[in-house]
A protein has these predicted regions:
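Extracytosolic ligand-binding ectodomains
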Residues: 1-125
């Protein structure tokens, strides 16, 4: 057994497709998390109308958590358009991003098992 940061949810499957279409290997550690971090920064800046640190800080939780339209990998344009119209978004991303009340991200890991000499996803923790 072993573990690897990641998710097995809806967004993870979509991310694999989007990454593959863009020539990106999505199997590495923290690939989905890195994608989500960049997307959240972009969305927070759009929500606040400025591209600076304070704007990101003030808006990242509002674009990452409910309420709002769920946004998955490959839907950044949709999210940017919604925010430009004053609508709320709930960025799910590749890793089902959710922040606690104090701004910490809930993490998830995939438990792996070796069968027939290959790693197989067993479950998400």
């Amino acid at each position: 057994f072993g573990s690897l940061p990641g998710s097995m949810g809806k967004g993870a499957g979509i991310f694999k497709e989007v990454a593959s279409a863009g020539g990106i290997d999505s199997s590495g550690p923290y690939t989905g998390e890195s994608y989500d971090a960049a997307a959240l920064i972009i969305l927070a800046m759009q929500a606040g109308g400025k591209a600076d640190r304070m704007t990101v800080q003030k808006n990242v939780m509002s674009v990452a958590n409910a309420p709002g339209t769920k946004i998955y990998p490959g839907e950044l344009k949709k999210a940017l358009d919604l925010l430009a119209k004053g609508k709320a978004v709930n960025y799910e991303g590749a890793t089902a991003v959710e922040f606690t009340d104090v701004g910490e991200a809930f993490g998830s890991f995939i438990e792996k098992e070796i069968k027939g000499g290959k790693f197989k996803d067993k479950k998400q923790r």
